[in-house]
């Protein structure tokens, strides 16, 4: 049971994080280039996303949208909800990284004939991502832990299975113990990998 639940948690979590990263890159680019109108939309999105719980967002998608004729499976609601929440955190992480890149580098790239898009993807973003590694890893861990609320929309994630074992067999210590172990198995390698990457990037001249 825990293996299947872990697979579901990882699959939905990974997809949500991938989309959150894409949203974060796009939104941080909008803020970096101060694009009119869009930057205000991004600001509203970031504030809305960061100041509402994931469970409320999931309830809106799973229970609210059907009221207007839009029905999504629970898995899709989980992915979209996690991407919506994570996108705002990734936006702030990338924005902080972008601010560390010296303006002269952008100006030099543009003077060499590179387009703004080429400058962003080839010059600015790689440096920003390197500096943002600690924040990005922290966000990934945070978002994977947030998947524990998926049981609220009937997704058979790790928390759902633990609740089932407690409710059906009254094995509270065993269920909670397995839950802790499962999350450690998932999250600890990510934390270690993040530490290794941070050290290597620091030795390479990125970060502080």
Regions found by a protein language model. Name each.
Residues 1-208:
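Transmembrane alpha-helices and adjacent helix-loop boundaries
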């Amino acid at each position: 049971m825990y293996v299947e639940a872990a697979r579901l948690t990882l699959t939905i979590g990974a997809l949500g994080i991938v989309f959150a990263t894409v949203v974060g890159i796009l939104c941080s680019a909008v803020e970096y280039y101060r694009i009119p109108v869009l930057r205000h939309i991004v600001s509203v999105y970031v504030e809305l996303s960061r100041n509402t719980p994931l469970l409320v967002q999931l309830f809106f998608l799973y229970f609210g949208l059907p009221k207007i004729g839009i029905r999504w499976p629970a898995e899709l609601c989980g992915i979209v909800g996690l991407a919506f929440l994570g996108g705002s955190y990734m936006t702030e992480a990338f924005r902080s990284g972008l601010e560390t890149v010296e303006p002269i580098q952008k100006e030099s790239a543009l003077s060499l004939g590179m387009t703004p898009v080429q400058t962003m993807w080839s010059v600015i973003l790689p440096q920003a991502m390197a500096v943002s590694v600690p924040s990005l890893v922290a966000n990934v861990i945070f978002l994977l832990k947030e998947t524990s609320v998926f049981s609220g929309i009937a997704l058979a994630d790790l928390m759902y299975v633990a609740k089932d074992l407690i409710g059906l067999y009254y094995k509270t210590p065993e269920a909670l113990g397995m839950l802790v172990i499962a999350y450690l198995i998932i999250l600890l390698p990510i934390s270690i990998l993040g530490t290794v990457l941070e050290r290597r990037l620091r030795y390479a001249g990125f970060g502080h």
